[in-house]
Amino acid sequence: MEFAENRYSRAHEILFDGGLRVMGSSSPLNVPPPMSVPAYMDPEEALVASVSSCHMLVFLYLASKAGLVVDAYRDQAAGYMEENEAGKMAFTRIVLRPAIAFSGPRLPTATEFDVLHKKAHENCYIANSLKAEIRIEPERISGLRSEGHGRPEYMS
């Protein structure tokens, strides 16, 4: 009877290639707990994370090809939903705010840094698949280091 009354759990498991299991749920902003689980990934978060991850991976590839060393990459991405022209809720804007630290004998110029992000955006097939405006607001910083792992840290 709970299902017919729309009081069922939205918790579910998402299985990825390679065996990764991620717990998913509707957003608690859309469906209140206990029918949703706030600690689980919701589709809105997954979409923004996919755009962020795609941009990061293309950026790292391009930086590596250019002979640059990226020590850390962290993105504080955000998605914005509004009513679209058809009166339906949709992502209208996704903003990526990557903070990137470089080291090594060659550091990118400001122009090269901007071009890397432009090319990363142009070659991100996830971003190319969406109608939402995608804005990149990168920051080149120093002092961003990994959390003591002894290896670079990439987080989107």
Where are these regions (language model features)?
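Extended beta-strand/beta-hairpin segments
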Residues: 1-49, 57-156
